[in-house]
Amino acid sequence: MIKLVLIRHGQSLWNLENRFTGWTDVDLSENGLSEAREAGAILKKNGYTFDVAYTSVLKRAIRTLWIVLHEMDLAWIPVHKCWKLNERHYGALQGLNKDETAKKYGEEQVHIWRRSIDVRPPALTEDDPRYEMNDPRYKALKKGELPLTECLVDTEKRVLAYWHSEIAPSLKSGEKVIISSHGNTIRSLVKYLDNLSSDGVVSLNIPTSIPLVYELDDNLRPIRHYYLSMDGEVPEGEIPKHISF
């Protein structure tokens, strides 16, 4: 049996401020740092170990992974970073307060932008200072590859391309894998693994920094999945609460 661990980064500064984040490279809040330490302690207490780790090129996911691996005495394992594991790109909404945006555009419109799978938010323009084309971490990308906005389908497409080219072969070779990433990235993976419908993924919420374990067969089909706490597996349908750590 193959085990895969997925973890959404700890609370970020913009999670705390209720802002659309997307590809903006904000760091963890103090609470997020604590959540990451707790996740590492949970995995260590439950006897988990890893051979390789995958993450995005955004510091909130990278730092979460660093902290988790440090808590597990696994800081030495290989870590692969790729933009294809970045959060969904929220276009011109990035940096805006979610409540203020709802007042401006209406709650229904903002809900559609956030939760529908195939509707993109308003795009950035190429002269917008938030456009990432000049960011050195994306220098290998061609202009057309760098998004100006994304819907969940767009995010899923790039995430699954990386899954099939890099992560799935690693799992099939017998390596123990952890992925530290973002809410919509993990939603995309869960949708694929569990073969969720569009309606099913719309209501799916991924909590910050709670280890989500998938048990997979040799063909990487899911047998079952569950969240982990200090006391072990959490009953299906329940999400453990964070403790001060």
Swiss-Prot record:
The protein's GO terms of the molecular function aspect are: phosphoglycerate mutase activity
- Superkingdom of the organism of origin: Bacteria
Q: Which UniProt keywords apply?
A: Gluconeogenesis, Glycolysis, Isomerase
- Tell me which residues this entry annotates as catalytic: 9 (tele-phosphohistidine intermediate), 87 (proton donor/acceptor)
Which reactions appear under catalytic activity for this entry? (2R)-2-phosphoglycerate = (2R)-3-phosphoglycerate
List the InterPro entries. His_Pase_superF_clade-1, His_PPase_superfam, PG/BPGM_mutase_AS, Phosphogly_mut1
Q: Name one GO biological process term.
A: gluconeogenesis
Instruction: Identify which top EC class this enzyme belongs to.
Output: isomerase
- TM annotation in the entry: none
Against HAMAP family, the record matches this protein to: PGAM_GpmA
What does this gene product do? Catalyzes the interconversion of 2-phosphoglycerate and 3-phosphoglycerate.
Query: What family is it from?
Result: Belongs to the phosphoglycerate mutase family. BPG-dependent PGAM subfamily.
Protein name per UniProt: 2,3-bisphosphoglycerate-dependent phosphoglycerate mutase 1
Q: Which organism is it from?
A: Bacillus cereus (strain ATCC 10987 / NRS 248)
- Gene behind this protein: gpmA1
